[in-house]
């Protein structure tokens, strides 16, 4: 998940285009959906290849770590390429890779296709938020960023549950084929609506030493690593946890995913309303709520209604956290936004991959019932760091 960038980029000449902004928001929806939709399909994919969910879950780790390793190098390699051409090429790779996922007859082939998608993802999130600002109608940059954030949020609300519904009805391969179809339509829309977009404010390797000399920014990146690792230790295995531990039916698991994602919308509203008044309090509160939800995952698994309520608080917590950290990153690195966001995306995906790997190890060694305890313990470490860093953040953001 990635978010807005500052609006200090030059807009395009002309009047801007809401069609382009909407297409970019749809693209954000598609890219976030495909990253996490395997979470809802682990059991089905495992049955296809006669593998355990812990083994299939490593696909999430590989995807995330490819994004993490590729984000900054790909951003630097492509920093001088005209953005419309680059974005269309990214979509071409994305669509072809999803067609390979649809055709996969082995887990190795599926992994190869996911690596192609991950490379497209790495470039996409390094450039897209700044493009939304540039193509927005004059004076409408904030609304454009809001639409992009909405697309990101809707991936959790609708994309992942819809992917599960399609997978349950028609098979997991059709889920990937459907994503390819929607991506192709979005690509054609962008091809028609986007103007030429020369690269701007992309930054360079010279930005890195400067950024890493900012203690508050370094703490932000460490918090991202810890808390996202905690989140995906449990979330990566929520489907097998719900099936095997909570004894919840497939239809109710889809409902849980909808509740989790829908509650994230409320987290976005909380962030919009209170982030300026209580920037650090919102961050600490969201980490504390996340830690509590993860630690209560197993104790509340026996009651569907309590478990559903927990899922909603969990959704609020993780989206509030993600938006808070993105906002801090962009304020602390407004002079090198593309580099800072490429680092953020890479580190976020280190957390996703690390969490999926830790969840796989815990599931294999202790059982899937223990993923909440493991994730919650890591979240508590993040909470302590956030509480200890209050003064550092206030000093850095007051300048």
Curated annotation (Swiss-Prot):
<dbReference type="InterPro" id="IPR036259">
    <property type="entry name" value="MFS_trans_sf"/>
</dbReference>
<feature type="transmembrane region" description="Helical">
    <location>
        <begin position="366"/>
        <end position="386"/>
    </location>
</feature>
<feature type="transmembrane region" description="Helical">
    <location>
        <begin position="21"/>
        <end position="41"/>
    </location>
</feature>
<keyword id="KW-0472">Membrane</keyword>
<comment type="similarity">
    <text>Belongs to the major facilitator superfamily. SotB (TC 2.A.1.2) family.</text>
</comment>
<feature type="transmembrane region" description="Helical">
    <location>
        <begin position="304"/>
        <end position="324"/>
    </location>
</feature>
<keyword id="KW-1003">Cell membrane</keyword>
<feature type="transmembrane region" description="Helical">
    <location>
        <begin position="215"/>
        <end position="235"/>
    </location>
</feature>
<feature type="transmembrane region" description="Helical">
    <location>
        <begin position="176"/>
        <end position="196"/>
    </location>
</feature>
<feature type="transmembrane region" description="Helical">
    <location>
        <begin position="142"/>
        <end position="162"/>
    </location>
</feature>
<keyword id="KW-0997">Cell inner membrane</keyword>
<dbReference type="InterPro" id="IPR020846">
    <property type="entry name" value="MFS_dom"/>
</dbReference>
<dbReference type="InterPro" id="IPR050189">
    <property type="entry name" value="MFS_Efflux_Transporters"/>
</dbReference>
<dbReference type="GO" id="GO:0015144">
    <property type="term" value="F:carbohydrate transmembrane transporter activity"/>
</dbReference>
<protein>
    <recommendedName>
        <fullName>Probable sugar efflux transporter</fullName>
    </recommendedName>
</protein>
<dbReference type="GO" id="GO:0005886">
    <property type="term" value="C:plasma membrane"/>
</dbReference>
<dbReference type="InterPro" id="IPR011701">
    <property type="entry name" value="MFS"/>
</dbReference>
<feature type="transmembrane region" description="Helical">
    <location>
        <begin position="281"/>
        <end position="301"/>
    </location>
</feature>
<dbReference type="InterPro" id="IPR023495">
    <property type="entry name" value="Sugar_effux_transptr_put"/>
</dbReference>
<keyword id="KW-0813">Transport</keyword>
<dbReference type="Pfam" id="PF07690">
    <property type="entry name" value="MFS_1"/>
</dbReference>
<comment type="function">
    <text>Involved in the efflux of sugars. The physiological role may be the reduction of the intracellular concentration of toxic sugars or sugar metabolites.</text>
</comment>
<feature type="transmembrane region" description="Helical">
    <location>
        <begin position="339"/>
        <end position="359"/>
    </location>
</feature>
<keyword id="KW-0762">Sugar transport</keyword>
<keyword id="KW-1133">Transmembrane helix</keyword>
<keyword id="KW-0812">Transmembrane</keyword>
<feature type="transmembrane region" description="Helical">
    <location>
        <begin position="115"/>
        <end position="135"/>
    </location>
</feature>
<feature type="transmembrane region" description="Helical">
    <location>
        <begin position="87"/>
        <end position="107"/>
    </location>
</feature>
<feature type="transmembrane region" description="Helical">
    <location>
        <begin position="56"/>
        <end position="76"/>
    </location>
</feature>
<feature type="transmembrane region" description="Helical">
    <location>
        <begin position="252"/>
        <end position="272"/>
    </location>
</feature>
């Amino acid at each position: 998940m990635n978010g807005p960038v500052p609006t200090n980029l030059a807009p395009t000449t002309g009047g801007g285009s809401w069609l382009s902004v909407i297409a970019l928001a749809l693209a954000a929806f598609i890219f976030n959906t495909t990253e996490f939709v395997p979470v809802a399909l682990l059991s089905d994919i495992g049955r296809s290849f006669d593998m355990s969910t812990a083994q299939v879950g490593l696909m999430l780790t590989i995807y995330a770590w490819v994004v993490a390793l590729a984000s900054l190098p790909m951003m630097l390699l492509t920093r001088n390429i005209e953005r419309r051409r680059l974005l269309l090429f990214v979509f071409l790779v994305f669509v072809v890779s999803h067609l390979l996922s649809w055709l996969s007859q082995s887990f190795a082939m599926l992994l190869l296709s996911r690596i192609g998608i991950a490379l497209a993802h790495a470039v996409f999130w390094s450039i897209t938020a700044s493009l939304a600002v540039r193509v927005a109608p004059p004076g409408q940059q904030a609304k454009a960023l809001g639409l992009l954030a909405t697309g990101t949020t809707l991936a959790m609300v609708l994309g992942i549950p819809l992917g599960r519904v399609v997978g349950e009805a028609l098979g997991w391969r059709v889920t990937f084929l459907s994503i390819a179809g929607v991506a192709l339509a979005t690509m054609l829309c962008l091809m028609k609506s986007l103007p030429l977009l020369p690269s701007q404010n992309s930054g360079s390797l010279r930005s890195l030493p400067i950024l890493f000399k900012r203690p508050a920014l370094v703490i932000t990146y460490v918090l991202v690593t810890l808390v996202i690792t905690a989140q995906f230790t449990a979330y990566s295995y929520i489907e097998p946890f719900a099936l095997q531990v909570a004894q919840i039916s497939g239809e109710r698991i889809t409902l849980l995913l909808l509740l989790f994602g829908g509650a994230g919308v409320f987290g976005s509203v909380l962030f919009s309303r209170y982030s300026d008044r209580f920037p650090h309090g919102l961050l600490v509160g969201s980490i504390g709520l996340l830690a509590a939800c993860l630690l209560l995952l197993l104790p509340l698994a026996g009651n569907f209604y309590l478990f559903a309520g927990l899922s909603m608080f969990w959704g609020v917590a993780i989206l509030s956290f993600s938006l808070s950290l993105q906002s801090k990153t962009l304020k602390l690195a407004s002079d090198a936004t593309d580099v800072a966001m490429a680092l953020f995306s890479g580190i976020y995906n280190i957390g996703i991959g690390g969490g999926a790997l830790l969840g796989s190890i815990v599931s294999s060694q202790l059982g899937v019932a223990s993923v909440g305890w493991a994730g919650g313990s890591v979240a508590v470490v993040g909470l302590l760091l956030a509480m200890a860093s209050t003064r550092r953040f206030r000093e850095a953001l007051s300048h």
